[in-house]
Amino acid sequence: MGTASSLVNPGEVIEDTYGGGGGEACVIPVEVKPKARLLRSSFRRGPRVIGASFKSTASVDLEYAAEYERLKKEYEIFRVSKNNEIASMQKKEVKLDEENKRLRAELQALQKTYQKILREKESAVEAKYQAMERAATFEHDRDKVKRQFKIFRETKEKEIQDLLRAKRDLEAKLQRLQAQGIQVFDPGESDSDDNGTELTVPGTQCEYWTSGGLGSEPSIGSMMQLQQSFRGPEFAHSSIDVEGPFANVNRDDWDAAVASLLQVTPLFSQSLWSNTVRCYLMYTAETQAEVKIFLKEYSPKLQRMCETSGYFFQVTFFPEECENQYFAVRKWEIEKSSIVILFICSSLPSCLQEDCEEAFLKNTEAKPCLIYHRIEDGRSDSEGLKQLLEQDTNKANKTKIVDHYGDPVEGANKIYCQLEQVINQDLLGIEITDPNAKDDSATKEEDDFWDVLWDVHDEQEQMEAFQQASHSICELGFQKYYDRLNDLVAAPAPIPPLLISGGPGSGKSLLLSKWIQLQQKHSPNTLMLYHFVGRPLSSSSEPSLMIKRLFLKLMQHSWSVSSLSLDPAKFLEEFPHWLEKLSIRYQGNIIIIIDSIDHIQQSEKHMKWLIDPLPVNVRVIVSVNVETCPQAWRLWPTLHLDPLNSKDVKSLINMECGRANIILTKEQERKLERHCRSATTCNALYVTLIAKLLTWAGSTGNIDDVLQLCLQCQDTVSLYRLALHSVQEVMPSAKDKEFMREILCFISASRNGVSECELMELCPGLTWPVLTSLIFHLYTLVLLKYSCGLIQFQHLQEILSFNILNFKAWDAVNLEYMQGDQSIISEYREKLIQHFNAQLSCDRVTWRSADELTWLYQQQGEKQKLHRCLMNLFVSQNLYKRGHFAELLSYWQLVGKDKISMASEYFDALKQYERSCEGEEKMTSLADLYETLGRFLKDLGLLSQAVTPLQRSLEIRETALDPDHPSVAQSLHQLAGVYVQSKKFGNAEQLYKQALEISENAYGSEHMRVARELDALAVLYQKQNKFEQAEQLRKKSLKIRQKSARRKGSMYGFALLRRRALQLEELTLGKDTSDNARTLNELGVLYYLQNNLETAETFLKRSLEMRERVLGADHPDCAQSINNLAALYNEKKQYDKAEELYERALDIRRRALSPDHPSLAYTVKHLAVLYKRKGKLDKAVPLYELAVEIRQKSFGPKHPSVATALVNLAVLYCQMKKQAEASPLYERAMKIYEDSLGRMHPRVGETLKNLAVLRYEEGDFEKAAELYKRAMEIKETETSVLGAKAHSGHSSSGGDTYSVQNALPVCAFPE
């Protein structure tokens, strides 16, 4: 039996085939253990089915056995895999243990190595510190020894110089004795040679040099002192003396004409020296319409025009109701004015008669004047007007009358056009030739000093400071101080600077300015370089600007080309080396005077070069306040200014009162004498201020009251406060007094002062009568002064409590109006910021806004606004182009930007600005900005970054203007300069040649731009050791510069010459006198120096005619005019006329002058050169021989000038094929050069070259090669000494020796 349950799986549903309900199969438990053997079924049919038995289907053992086998297999597989994993992990563990052991060993080794290196580092650091200490000690000892050796060397050189001078004096005495017929012993016949001392001075006459390695050069001061200070025509003070228009004119003539122009001269009125074009305007009621139109429409245009040239422009006028008031003020304004304008119709009111008489009839300085005369039908001019027009036209001859009939608008336009022409031509000195020719103006300033940037306003400020400091006519017993200063100049070198000390207001500036005037008068060969330091934190107290200005003043006396660094640190460091280099090129003393040197920012740090020994011909004088003098400077020789004694006090007060026609009573004098006995009341400024207050009060008649108030003031500040109260009392209204307070506060809050036109804009409601009256009173009481067109306070004082330097007047204003409250100062500075920001918003970027706005932001601590201001490209361009490089860097450092950040931000700003540029004018401005950025980056040392903006500037100019435009040459020149500094000489040479070609095509072959390119190419060839090519270019450049009719660095240039010529022309309108004839001659020379040859010829002819009438035809003065006329014709290449006049002048001077007179020598020289130029060699020979005789009589037979004359004569003989006669002359000249200048002097080398050519022509090739080789050795020696610089453009003949440099055939001598 069995069941069918084993045939189905558990849980399956079993269907009922009989229709019944199905059920689920389940496992029926077996309760009875089955038997081991079952009975076979008796009814089984068919074959047996496997597993169909009950045993096979229901057996548990079979089921579990299968499952067991399966699990067993799985377990076995699992076990084997896990065993494998365990074995693998064990292997990895073993491997990791081994790696761990290895790493631990390495770690221990590294730790040991680290400890070893750490110990070595500590020992190395300790050794480094010890080495640094030893180096510092060694450097200190080296500097000490170096300084001692320099002192020793300079002392010995001075002794040598004194011995040489004594030797020359003895030779001169010997020659005089021989001339008198006294037989004396001739040292030349003795066995001993008194000229045996060899003085080797390589390169002392070299004019051209660049900034080579300063550290490797010998002391140029010593080189200069070893050279004898020979006098002679070829030993000129500068290359301007050698040839060209200056050489053709007698040196005495042009020295007299030019010397006063190169120094500060008081011949010009304050208005011409001021930085303001002042128009004094007068009008009547009938012409008010024209005046209103002129002031509204045309005055702003003139203001923009003057701002472009760096000048202020203002129109001062008094309304008709004020004409009867302010008489003294109106007279003062007329005196200050640059031009007077009168608007008038048919009558002249009585209220204007005094002003017209003062402006037109008493116009002693010949100022330009304009009269607008409106003509109306049916009205005739009054008698007073007719008389004014007739008198002024006949006498002054400087008044232009504009007659107008018709519309007032047209009349105002006429007077505007006339005024514009007068301002440009007569006041600013701008020649108007082509209205469209404005391209050259952008770089005019840079041409004056090649690539050196400078600020014309800084120079003008110094000149005005000198004038104001020397204004006093009372010298207060300065003679004893003058003697001490003179002793300093005459003392043997080396000596430290002289310290002039004294209290504030003791007269230090006055003493220095008066002594400078005396030196200029009595020692014209002494170069005076002065700097007056003004208000602290002003431009004048910036050390880098001061040093650069002094350097440029030195450069006026040397035609050198310099690559001057604008980096302030390098500039201040290299200045002593530049001073040594330049001192040798000036044959005379150089005196540097710095007033108030203690006011310079970080003076002790930046003036360290004063401690080192100075070059032998350099003297330094500085003034300081006693309280603020640095301790290291107190060891210098000191000249202390004592307080005034009672005599000086009385003299000063009486002099000031006498000028105002005021006489003090005896009682008043006694009161003053008793009062002025203490140190503060005997101060020069204190006494001057008392005198000013008394004279100012004298007009009101209350001297006793003012004197009593003055006696209550015990110091200068209290006196200034009294002066402020006195001026306030005369102001007519409370509103005017408020204006006074605001004006003084604006001046106090500004950096360099405020101009009058700026005050009119800053103070709404302020009128010209009130402003001019206030300034007049404050100026009279020495509270205010003018400086470069700005109103400033006078006199400095140190306020120790604030540790800042201030004006005494500023201190008084601070106490009176601000009570030391910084918030009030900040308030007025904010008003100034708003004013200058308004100018920037109108695209008016002037030197004033660039200077003041950046400084005001710095003082206010507004860094973000300062940064925005610096990002104004035109503000930064203005600062950079005026040389304020150090100031610009300091501002960027203040806002936290480095050089790379600056460059990046400027690039981004330029790119943004370029997107808005359209039109030629905008593109030209963009090119200028790119060029400025390139130059700025070059000065920062970022040469690779500088190339991109310069290339962009070049592209813009070539596209917007023309590839041959002169400004393209400017871009090429600047880009080449960057390549030179980057040592890419091939690229630089190509660019320089392109710039040269463009400049020659645009300006001609004798323009200063051409000379600049030639100089740049010469420097480039010098760096490449192409010395012959470099020297050729330098000589060519030198000739161009000599022919240029201006002196480099003269601040006013032709404008000064033109104004001086106009003044002289006014002086020659009188009778025939010798003085007028001399003035005419001087006037002709001045026009000649301007290359205005036609006008010069007219005046020289007038001078000659007047001298012949007054003095006679054979007078030496007539020979002077004839000689100058001959020089003029020589310059015009009219050689026949020049020859005739030279012969006539020579005849007169031979009969009238001594045989060795310098004027005779000049005429002989120029006539001989003219003969040689015309090929009349036979006529030239006796003149050259005469030149030798004259120089022998003047300087002695062994003077270099004699050798030069011998060389000239020898060259002439060579040209005449008389080599036999030339040879001994060359040998004699070479012997003189070797004995006097040294065997390695360039003059010896030039003579050897000439002699080599002579031997070559004679066929003695071996001797010629020997001489030429020695000449080249001298040249190489000179080049190595001067840092690879070429020889001077001065030829050995002083300009008229035949050049043999290229006369030798190619391959004449082996290399």
Swiss-Prot record:
Residues 81-183 form a coiled coil. Keywords: Cell projection, Cilium, Coiled coil, Repeat, TPR repeat, Wnt signaling pathway. Required for normal ciliary development and function. Inhibits disheveled-1-induced canonical Wnt-signaling activity and may also play a role in the control of non-canonical Wnt signaling that regulates planar cell polarity. Probably acts as a molecular switch between different Wnt signaling pathways. Required for proper convergent extension cell movements. TPR repeats lie at residues 889-923, 927-960, 969-1002, 1011-1044, 1077-1110, 1119-1152, 1161-1194, 1203-1236, 1245-1278. Pfam families: NPHP3 (PF25022), NPHP3_hel (PF24884), NPHP3_N (PF24883), TPR_12 (PF13424), TPR_7 (PF13176), TPR_NPHP3 (PF24885). Its main location: other. GO terms for biological process: cilium assembly; negative regulation of canonical Wnt signaling pathway; regulation of Wnt signaling pathway, planar cell polarity pathway; Wnt signaling pathway. This is Nephrocystin-3. GO terms for cellular component: cilium.
